[in-house]
């Protein structure tokens, strides 16, 4: 998994297990998770719809999506993945699409689900308000709301990236 991650450009990620629970040196960054999210959306569109479902029935049992609250609260939200461990906190990689714009955001280390969802809402709102269609990946600017975050504007997307490679345990 780590080799594949590196090949995708996830330079600061090391996978130590497939389930994502805390393990020594099992780490990633918001930037790397955004790269993974983008690859998931665009490289595997036939599977991406699975991440936007509120629930699924498997063998007569209903399994609920862990990000269904965010999906139902944010206009255009269509995925992707939540996570939590004691060491990593509450995390979310999310994507939303409005018209021709798709914004991907990643929040690591929140102290609660509600704070995580609030931060993600703020990030996606900033993305939709500030991104332009067909802009090359060259424009960097600081966000005063999150001084340790930069944004990279790109064609139909806004990638939120930590200025420093803050590594956190994966969940």
Give the predicted meaning of each segment.
Residues 1-11:
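Beta-lactam-recognizing serine transpeptidase/beta-lactamase-like catalytic domain environment
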Residues 10, 14, 22-27, 31-171:
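Domain-terminus/edge residues, biased toward the C-terminal soluble/receptor-binding domains
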Residues 18:
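Short, conserved loop-to-beta-strand elements that form functional interface hotspots
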């Amino acid at each position: 998994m780590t080799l594949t991650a590196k090949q995708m450009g996830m330079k600061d990620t090391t996978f130590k297990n497939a389930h994502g629970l805390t393990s020594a040196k099992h780490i990633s960054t918001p930037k790397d998770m955004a790269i993974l999210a983008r690859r998931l959306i665009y490289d595997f569109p036939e599977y991406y719809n699975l991440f936007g479902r509120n629930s699924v029935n498997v063998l007569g049992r209903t399994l609920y999506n862990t990000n269904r609250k965010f999906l139902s609260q944010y206009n255009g939200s269509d995925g992707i993945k939540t996570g939590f461990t004691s060491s990593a906190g509450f995390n979310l990689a999310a994507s939303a699409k409005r018209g021709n714009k798709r914004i991907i955001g990643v929040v690591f280390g929140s102290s609660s689900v509600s704070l995580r969802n609030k931060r993600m809402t703020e990030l996606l709102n900033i993305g939709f308000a500030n991104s332009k269609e067909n802009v090359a990946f060259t424009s960097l600017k600081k966000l005063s709301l999150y001084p340790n975050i930069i944004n990279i504007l790109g064609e139909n997307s806004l990638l939120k990236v930590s200025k420093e490679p803050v590594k956190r345990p994966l969940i």
